[in-house]
Regions:
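Generic structural motif
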Residues: 1-6
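Buried, small/hydrophobic-residue-enriched core segments of structured protein domains
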Residues: 10-361
Length: 361
């Protein structure tokens, strides 16, 4: 609850953000009736959906394909809970869930009500939180470098999506929020995020509110390192947080602050595979697509990335679907875009094709 204090618009009157000043301390919060374990076990899928929509937590789910909030009354063939994160500078979900494992388990017990298929809990190395014994709930552990922690990678290997096969994804912190909603009657508005980047004096985990002002979060946090760029999200798939977009994204769990860069380092390739500095330097120039074998090296999915990128750039949606674009989101192509010497934004091309496919049916 709060008061709208600003409406920020971009080019062509595009709505960038609506700024809501939160209610003063001590004002009445929104509460729901807490349910016992027996009452939760007796819930139906429609009852669960109704409370999630009333609380605003229905928007925590996203569909694959297309990455949309599910339509009311729709049901997926599988649900994927993301409890691992391999993005640069990201927090360890095991630590976040370990702060309140009961809420996480309570939320997991409810998710099978929304699907007739399997609920996959995708974890990473070091996960030691106990899982509830629930029918159609399966823990799968992933390891390896990025993008091993992305939902698209998990779906590809466990239960691929496509035309007529829709899966939902949800973050582990949102599962904890669902657990608190039903077992305690609370509507959590907080989220644990990672503040990271060499421009910050104190990189750390921080509990804040969803949609928080990033300018306020980073007050007095900068080192004296020249120009910096602030991102909501990771350095690979986040967005620039400035002006009307200087707020924490709904699905972002980190804020990254990196040097603006722009300087070329003489013989920088001699540094080998040691520690490197994340900056905004492109180390390349805009040109036509260059089909390099490095795409296959960083793409764990069983697809042909160069052929797919070519189809996306020329807007050949039929060929793009045949090559697996319906399984993907922008974050799945972010690493390829980072490595591309032509500086091609494959994520934007993917989103354009997905929107066209969605419109055409």
């Amino acid at each position: 609850q709060g008061v709208i204090s600003a409406v920020n618009r971009g080019p062509r009157r595009r709505l960038d953000s609506v700024v809501v000043q939160s209610q003063p301390s001590g004002a009445e919060d929104v509460h729901f009736e807490p349910l016992s374990d027996e009452q939760q076990a007796a819930l139906g899928s429609d009852d669960l959906e109704h409370r999630l929509q009333r609380s605003g937590l229905w928007g925590a789910f996203r569909t694959r394909p297309f990455s949309r909030v599910p339509l009311s009354g729709s049901r997926p063939h599988a649900i994927f809970v993301t409890a691992t994160d391999t993005r640069p500078l990201a927090a360890d979900p095991a630590v976040i869930v370990g702060a309140d494992p009961g809420a996480f388990r309570s939320g997991l017990r409810l998710l099978p009500l929304l699907t007739s298929g399997t609920v996959y809990v995708c974890t990473g190395p070091g996960w030691n939180n106990e899982m509830p014994e629930v029918e159609r709930l399966t823990e799968v552990r992933f390891s390896g470098p990025h993008p091993a922690g992305l939902p698209g990678t998990h779906m590809h290997f466990l239960d691929p999506v496509g035309t007529g096969r829709v899966a939902w994804q949800i973050d582990c912190q949102d599962v904890m929020a669902i657990g608190k909603l039903f077992s305690r009657g609370e509507v959590p508005s907080s989220r644990v995020i990672a503040l990271g980047g060499e421009c910050l004096s104190r990189p750390r985990l921080l509990e804040t509110v969803m949609g928080a002002s990033i300018d306020e979060l980073l007050a007095d946090e900068f080192r004296q390192c020249g120009g910096c760029r602030t991102l909501s999200g990771s350095v690979l798939d986040g967005r620039r947080a400035s002006d009307g977009l200087a707020y924490l994204g709904r699905y972002h769990a980190q804020v990254s602050v990196i040097p603006e860069g722009g300087d070329r380092r003489l013989f920088g390739w001699l540094l080998g595979k040691g520690m490197r500095s994340w900056s905004t330097s492109q180390n390349g120039r805009y040109s036509g697509m260059i089909p390099l074998p490095v795409f296959e090296k960083v793409m764990p999915l069983d697809i042909l990335p160069a052929a797919l990128f070519r189809a996306l750039l020329v807007k050949d949606t039929d060929q793009a679907q045949a090559l697996g674009c319906l399984e993907l989101d922008e974050e799945d192509l972010a690493l390829c875009a980072y490595l591309c010497p032509a500086k091609t934004e494959y994520g934007q091309a993917l989103r354009s094709s997905l929107e066209q496919i969605e419109r055409d049916g």
